Structures are given as C-alpha cells and as structure tokens.
From Swiss-Prot:
InterPro entries: GPCR_Rhodpsn, GPCR_Rhodpsn_7TM, Olfact_rcpt. This is Olfactory receptor 5AC2. The gene is OR5AC2. Belongs to the G-protein coupled receptor 1 family. Residues 1-27, 78-101, 157-198, 261-273 are extracellular. One of its GO terms (biological process) is sensory perception of smell. Keywords: Cell membrane, Disulfide bond, G-protein coupled receptor, Glycoprotein, Membrane, Olfaction, Receptor, Sensory transduction, Transducer, Transmembrane, Transmembrane helix. The chain crosses the membrane at residues 28-48, 57-77, 102-122, 136-156, 199-219, 240-260, 274-294. Glycans are attached at residue 7. It comes from Homo sapiens. Residues 49-56, 123-135, 220-239, 295-309 are cytoplasmic. Odorant receptor. Disulfide bonds join 99-191.
Length: 309
C-alpha cells in the first residue's frame, strides 16, 4: 500500500525476497525450515519445562539455561513463522508495522541473549574457580536478579532503534532483499538519510557485544588456567565438558553478530550476509538446547526421570 504525502508516495508495505529467487525451491525450504522450527521449539520449551519441574535443576546454572532457552525460542519465533508464510505466499508482502514489530522482538531477544551468555560464563567461573564461595557469590536470589536485569535491558535497548526507525520514510523502493526485516536492509531503501540510525546501531552494537564478549573471554581464560592446575584428569574432563559447549555456542553467536553489526560497510554480497544471519536467527536457537543438554549429566538424569514416569 502507498500513501501520498505532498509530492511523495510513501511506502507502507514491503516485499521480502527471502532466501532464494528460485520458486521451485520454496516448497523444499518450507518443509526444511518447518521441521527446524518445530525441533527448535520442542528443544527449547522442553528444556524450560524440564528445569521448571525438576527440583534438582533449581540452581543458578539451570536458571540461566532456562532463560537462554526462552530467549532462543523468542528469536526463532520472531523470524521463522513469517518466513514460512512467505515461502507459500507469492506476494511475500509485510506491512511496515509488522516489519518494525519483527525487528523489535528479534533485537530484544538477541540483546537478552548477549547478557545471559555473560551470566552463564560468570556462573561457570565462580563454580570452577571458587567452588567453596559459590553458594555466596551466586545464590538463587542473585541469579534471579541478574536474569531479570538481562531481560529488562533486552526490552529497553531495541526501543532506541525503533524510535529512530519511525523517523525514516520509504518512498522509492519497497523490496527488501532478505528473509526478514533486517534493520540494515531497511536503511538501504529509506528516502531520508539513515546515517544517525546506522551510527546508533554501530555504537550500541559495539557497547553491548564487545564488552560482553570480552567478559566471557576473561572468565573462560581464568577457568582454563584453573582447569590446567587441576591434577585430577577426571576433574579436567568434567570442567572442559561443561565449558566447551558454552564456548562453541558463544563463538558461533558472537562471531556472526559482530560481523553483521560491528563492522564498516564492506560491500559484501547480500547472499553472504543472509548466511551469517541464518546462524544467529535460526541455527543457533536450534543447536543451543542440545549443545547444553546432551553433555550435561544433571539435565540428562532429569530427562530420564521424566521418561520413566
């Protein structure tokens, strides 16, 4: 839909071109991503229910893990259902209001996840490096407060970008060459200059992603040195097993996020950017519940107790 304003025709609906311009692949992609979405939701929501119902998992580590699972479920839900609709809809239209809403919920869950990963790294640092002080330094009350702070920051941060986004007008093009309403793609088709918007994305991205990543790196560096000091091979194996999964998830998540949002314009192909976006919007939310659960003995014991019932 277009609205006339003076001599300009303002665009209020956009066309999402999706992952491919080959129509014969749409049905195949629909089936693949539907299966991925269902597995993602079952994995993450199942993990939340498991942690909620099992008293043995009512500990800070699993509280953060449950928070991460909820954040991943929100990330996937903000992107995948609309993408599935577009695979079957020849027009693939999305309104400006829907576009901004999709961006808000994605940005909110992504911001929350950055801080949750920091909390989880700190939790592992305290548990491995200061086990005797763990009940004091990471109590259930403190972990609940930290979890709440992560979600509050995640709720507030995207409002800055949404308010700036509402200042932009779209009057020339309405085609977004992407599979969701990615904010940098909206900047490309805006009529008025998005330089302030782009600057805020870079500044907030740098101030959120880089300090949180550095905190995680420092925490795990300390953990690594502590592990290497352990004489027990069993103790080393257990600690590496616990932290290795976390580091894998962090590397994938931060690597793609920083490459997308904390970098100068590089003129890279849009298809390459789509691949990076797929990692933090769809692939990582799919993998996280399995990365954290399959190597965690307490989670697996809790799952076996549920199956036996």
């Amino acid at each position: 839909m277009d609205i006339s304003e003076g001599n300009k025709t303002l665009v209020t609906e956009f066309v999402l071109t999706g992952l491919t311009d080959r129509p014969w692949l749409h049905v195949l992609f629909f089936v693949v991503f539907l299966v991925v979405y269902l597995i993602t939701m079952v994995g993450n929501l199942g993990l939340i229910v498991l942690i909620w119902n099992d008293p043995h998992l009512h500990m800070p580590m699993y509280l953060f893990l449950g928070g991460l699972a909820f954040s991943d479920a929100c990330t996937s839900t903000s992107i995948t259902p609309r993408m599935l609709v577009n695979f079957l809809d020849k027009t693939a239209m999305i309104s400006l209001a829907e576009c901004i809403t999709q961006f808000y919920f994605f940005a909110s869950s992504a911001t929350t996840e950055c801080f949750l990963l920091v909390m989880m790294a700190y939790d592992r640092y305290v548990a491995i490096c200061n086990p005797l002080l763990y009940p004091v330094m990471m109590s259930n009350k403190l972990s609940a407060q930290l979890l709440s702070i992560s979600y509050v920051i995640g709720f507030l941060h995207p409002l800055v970008h949404v308010s700036l986004l509402l200042r932009l007008t779209f009057c020339r093009f309405n085609i977004i060459h992407y599979f969701y309403c990615e904010i940098l793609q909206l900047f490309k088709i805006s009529c008025n200059g998005p330089s302030i918007n782009a600057l805020m994305i870079f500044i907030f991205g740098a101030f959120i992603q880089i300090p949180t990543l550095m905190t995680i790196i420092i925490s795990y560096t300390r953990v690594l040195f502590d592990i290497l000091k352990k004489k027990s091979e069993k103790g080393r194996s257990k600690a590496f097993s616990t932290c290795g999964a976390h580091l894998l998830s962090v590397s994938l998540y931060y690597g793609t996020l920083i490459f997308m949002y904390v970098r100068p314009a590089s003129g890279l192909a849009e298809d390459q950017d789509k691949v990076y976006s797929l990692f933090y919007t769809i692939i990582i939310p799919l993998l996280n519940p399995f990365i954290y659960s399959l190597r965690n003995k307490k989670v697996m014991h809790a799952l076996r107790r549920v199956i036996r019932k």
